[in-house]
Design a protein with these regions (language model features):
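Alpha/beta enzyme core
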Residues: 2-27, 47-51, 66-191, 211, ...
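Conserved structured core elements
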Residues: 9-13, 103, 130-133, 137, ...
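Generic secondary-structure signature for well-ordered alpha-helical cores
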Residues: 17-25, 50-53, 111-118, 141-149, ...
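A cross-family glycoside hydrolase active-site/sugar-binding cleft signature
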Residues: 33-35, 59-63, 81-83, 121-125, ...
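A mid-to-C-terminal "edge-of-domain" accessory segment
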Residues: 249-390
Length: 390
């Protein structure tokens, strides 16, 4: 929504295939969500379903009407999201209803969804501004009654629509992430496996709030590739992959190397510029410009690299050449650019290193402020080697 140029049908299919590879056979990326209101979206949904993947399961987000329920059921979708906004801002000012009218309307929608043979996923929009005990708990409790009576599981997606959730202990509801997840379980009787967290990053708390929701019992968190989403974005799927690995000590079948392939595809094939410092995905996430850091990387990569980015993400650590790179930065750049290992490695004593250092120093002593590109380095190396037989 309002976040980037929409993907084409072919791009959606390709990204779905990459998500399948990224999540692995254990289905760590459990579900995906499609709109069904344009031919392009419906074509993508149908073609992705034809692939026959178990994971990610294809679900939809639809308007709450019997016609739409029948539409997604006819396609073969088994679960759909329905919007059930729960704050007074939405109930009173957006929909012009009372709380009772909203509750009755929502119960009718959920009943229609079940009657159509679908599993409802109720999106509790704006939950971090809702009356938790006055509306959220009674509504969620009623949904659990319907679930028991019908035998159909009903999920609740707790949506922090404006990113107002707070992860710290002792915070009052409705802004307490832990309080929301705890309250849904213990006051409304919602099982952990029926609770999802949907966060936004307006206050830079997207990832930490999602992790907090996990820790307090939400079985799933909603993510988007690279965190792309409305306004400031949502929770990046690549961030939660490493959060999961940090918490559990295992990737559990995920293949994080596909993060790199996804990032390059989004940047090169969909023309979406990824900020270079984006963790795990940006061009410069494991790049250093400081000579002292390059010196440490040469002695032991673990000193200044967050983990073995080469084996996990197919992204070896890099250095760029600036006025602070020193001979250490130049040596590191040479060895990695030309795959020098062992006895063939350049050292600070090599004549080529000395000449390059002299040239780099001269560049910045004469007013240069931009880093030296790889192409410039290669051109200068060719010039030096030709002139001095280095």
């Amino acid at each position: 929504q309002q976040s980037r140029t929409p993907y084409t049908t072919e791009q959606m299919i390709h990204l779905y295939k990459l998500l399948h590879k990224l999540g692995g056979d254990n289905g760590m990326i459990r579900q995906t969500e499609f709109f069904v209101y344009s031919k392009k979206d419906r074509d993508a949904l149908e073609k992705c379903m034809e692939l026959g993947y178990r994971f990610p399961e294809i679900t939809t987000w639809i308007r709450a009407s019997k016609k739409d329920f029948e539409l997604v059921r006819s396609i073969g979708v088994k679960e759909t999201g329905v919007l059930v906004s729960c704050s007074d801002y939405h109930i009173f000012h957006k929909m012009g209803l009372t709380r009772k009218e909203a509750l009755d309307k929502y119960i009718g929608i959920v009943s229609d969804c079940i009657e159509a043979g679908l599993r409802p996923r109720c999106h509790f929009e704006d939950i971090t501004r809702a009356d938790f005990y006055g509306f959220v708990v009674p509504f969620a409790s009623r949904l659990m009654e319907i679930s028991r009576e019908s035998g159909v599981p009903i999920k609740i997606r707790a949506c922090d629509t404006l990113g107002l959730g707070v992860p710290y202990p002792g915070v009052a509801l409705p802004r307490s992430v832990s309080g929301i997840i705890y309250g849904l379980q213990h006051y409304a009787g919602v099982p952990s496996d029926m609770i999802e967290w949907h966060g936004h990053n307006d206050f830079y708390k997207g990832v930490v709030n999602a992790t907090t929701a996990w820790m307090y019992g939400a079985s799933a968190v909603n993510c988007s590739l690279l965190g792309i989403g409305e306004r400031t974005g949502n929770v990046p799927v690549e961030a939660m992959i490493f959060e999961y690995a940090s918490l559990r000590g295992t990737m559990n079948g995920m293949h994080p190397e596909y993060i790199t392939e996804i990032a390059r595809y989004i940047e090169n094939d969909t023309n979406y510029p990824i900020p270079p410092m984006t963790p795990f995905a940006g061009q410069n996430f494991n790049l250093t410009r400081a000579g002292i850091h390059a010196d440490g990387l040469m002695k032991n990569p673990e000193i200044y690299n967050i983990f073995d980015t080469e084996s996990i993400l197919n992204r070896p650590p890099k250095v760029s050449i600036t006025g602070t790179s020193g001979t250490a930065g130049i040596v590191f750049w040479l060895n990695h650019s030309y795959s020098r290992r062992g006895e063939k490695e350049y050292t600070k004593k090599d004549p080529l290193v000395a000449k390059l250092y002299e040239w780099v120093t001269d560049q910045f002593d004469n007013g240069r402020i931009t880093m030296i590109s790889d192409a410039e380095m290669e051109e200068q190396i060719a010039t030096l080697c030709e002139a001095q037989d280095l």
